[in-house]
Amino acid sequence: MRKVILVITVILLSGIITAQPGRAPQVEPLPAGFKPSSTNTFISQYPAVNQQTRQAIFRVVAPDATSVQLRLGGNMEMKKDDKGVWWITTEPLVVGFHYYGIAINGVEVADRGTKTYFGSNWESSGIEIPEGPEGDYYRFNKNIPHGQIRSILYWSEVNGLERHVNVYVPAEYESNTNKRYPVLYLVHGWGEDENGWSIQGHMGNIMDGLIAAGKAVPMIVVMPSGDIQTNPDVRTASGNITDIFVKDLIPFIDKTFRTKTDRQNRAMAGLSRGGMQTTTTVFSNMDKFAWIGTFSGFFMGGMGGPGGGTAPSVETAFNGVFKDAAAFDKQINLLFISTGTEERGPKEQVDALKAHGIKHIVYHESQ
């Protein structure tokens, strides 16, 4: 029997080996300094990225097209060569992850050279402009323990539907079975979904590194959807997401995982719209949270915020949650507010809160 299996295996392998050269794609050498983007599909050479210049080359095979555009922060016209291939080399791009699309004769499609990512409310292409060694914090480190990211469905009584959530557990979770963990609820921004933090954002690698370096305590990170499907036929961003978080999600997580269930061990943070959902949820449920963070998502109205208008007083914002500064500081251990250097940030609002006497607040600007 073993000899028969061996013979069959040799025959199969021989067929595979002889078939491979005929199936292998023709790989053209890339221009000097360029490498395939880390977001590319397995056999795709393009888009290609130059880490030193931060430029990218995009390639689209569309011989019958009359116009092709790269849509990456704007519309960029691509040029066609004599083989029907369209090309463009960008100006230097900002480091980090970028969504993009390709418009062929005005119809926007994803670039089949890359994996797809859910952003701007559709499955688009993505490209990563890598940092240097300073970006190692979000890269996989083979020398440290790694946690798990679990994909879970739970039932929402508020929504009347099943909902999806991703949950990060630290590397020690399965071996340290008597230990309970604090929980961070981390909410995505508008146009993205609950997968963005772990895929585009490399959240798992970041948490693994912080925990291994002793810069973060081992914790559970819950990444829910910030959208609401109001009925089986319509998906919409409207609705009371706070009720789903508080009445459905938190009880489910506390029942399913070994969590510390008191407010001192529960935090919430969010990006953009997720930051606004975070402030709405936490400031209306101060008995359940002691830590809060917003990334480009803190807005009290007016005071340099989007839309202008008359600023509410610090005492009336969020139904008066800041009115008694000492009481706020007693309940909230940290209010972390961050924004990008290119954004119209909430610094004036933070300054007003500090002047009012709020001490447990940190403001940060990043690239």
Language model features with spans:
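Residue-level detector of intrinsically disordered/flexible regions characterized by low predicted structural confidence
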Residues: 4-5, 339
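Positively charged n-region of N-terminal signal peptides that target proteins for export
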Residues: 1-4, 20
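Bacterial N-terminal signal peptides
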Residues: 7-15
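Non-catalytic cap/lid and distal C-terminal segments of serine-dependent acyl enzymes
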Residues: 21-25, 29-38, 44, 50-69, ...
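Residues in and immediately flanking transmembrane alpha helices
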Residues: 15-16, 201
